[in-house]
Amino acid sequence: MSGQQFEGFGQKGGGVGRRPALVIIDMNNGFTDPASPLVCDLDDTIAAIRKLLDAARRAEVPVVYTTVSYGEGDKVTAKAFIEKVPALLTLAAGSSWVEIDERLAPRPNEPVLNKLYASAFFGTPFASLLASHQCDSVIVTGASTSGCVRATAVDALQHGYRPVVPREAVGDRNPAAHDAALYDIDLKYGDVVPLDDCLTALEGLVGTHAR
């Protein structure tokens, strides 16, 4: 494709705003434990998210987690998704697989939303949480880049929030899909930025952002 065909795409969307939220997508044991059939290599991703989590807490910006778990009734609700990805049945409600990795353990005032599909917005109160905090942007982290991260970034934009994706704080089991998703997000939906840019933005909010 010619450069002219890309003209008007890939403009920077404003980055981290004055009232961001940090969302940590699916850092539950089912995706981080090597014993799980759904595991990704996420150690470096978790280390990057940890830095963002510490910075977000210092700045007192909202932190929201998602996990994925399926009870018996959910297997009917999410039937089409489970048929496409049968390994999702590993994520049984009440099992250790659906608990957040202890390296990123949530605090009592940090909601953990359960989702049945890819986007953090679909079938959850995430949009209401962002509205209640008067957020203007969402720092999207976690896994997988080509699945739930991308879906959440797209839905953030569609709900009126600027999505920002720190490159080092997302991961995928497929490097090609990871790179393609980041390219796509940066071209059309949000800002893909270095981790340090997000850390600097959050440090600049210390003392200014009350929940």
For each predicted feature, which ranges?
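Active-site-proximal loop->helix
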Residues: 173-186
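Short acidic-hydrophobic, aromatic-tinged amphipathic segments that line or gate anion-handling sites
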Residues: 113, 190-200
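Internal catalytic-core helix/loop-beta-alpha segment
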Residues: 94-143
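Short glycine/serine/threonine-rich phosphate/pyrophosphate-binding segments
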Residues: 145-152
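Glycine-centered short loops/turns at secondary-structure junctions
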Residues: 58-61, 134, 160
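Active-site acidic carboxylates
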Residues: 1-107, 111, 201-211
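A short glycine-rich beta-strand->turn/loop micro-motif centered on a GG-aromatic cluster
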Residues: 139-142, 162-175
